[in-house]
């Protein structure tokens, strides 16, 4: 009896940790996919300029008919080596 309760406790603990981990990964993945798209007929250069003023850059889709602005920052990468003195 004691071993069954122990196994159930470990199973519940594993399920809880797995759920938290998966929710964290899903949130991280979705945070880099936030785009606001406007159906504008402007050049790609104008799209980039307009998006740079209000967000973290833009991209043209459908040959410039759709302008999408990125609303979340790109990932940051840091060099693990300290700067040389």
UniProtKB/Swiss-Prot annotation:
Compartments it resides in: Secreted
Transmembrane helix in keyword set: no
GO BP field: defense response to fungus; killing of cells of another organism
GO annotation, cellular component aspect: extracellular region
UniProt entry keywords in alphabetical sequence: Antimicrobial, Disulfide bond, Fungicide, Plant defense, Secreted, Signal
Disulfide links within the chain: 37-69, 44-60, 47-67, 51-68
Signal sequence residues: 1-31
Broad class of the protein's primary localization: secreted
Superkingdom of origin organism: Eukaryota
Family that this chain belongs to: Belongs to the DEFL family.
Protein name as it appears in the record: Putative defensin-like protein 79
Native organism: Arabidopsis thaliana (Mouse-ear cress)
């Amino acid at each position: 009896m004691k071993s069954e309760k122990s196994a159930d406790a470990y199973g519940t603990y594993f399920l809880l940790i797995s759920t938290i981990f998966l929710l964290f990964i899903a949130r991280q993945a979705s945070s880099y996919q936030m785009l606001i798209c406007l159906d504008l007929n402007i050049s790609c250069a104008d799209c980039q300029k307009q998006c740079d003023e209000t967000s973290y850059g833009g991209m043209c889709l459908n040959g410039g008919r759709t302008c999408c602005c990125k609303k979340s920052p790109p990932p940051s990468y840091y060099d693990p080596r300290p700067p040389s003195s």
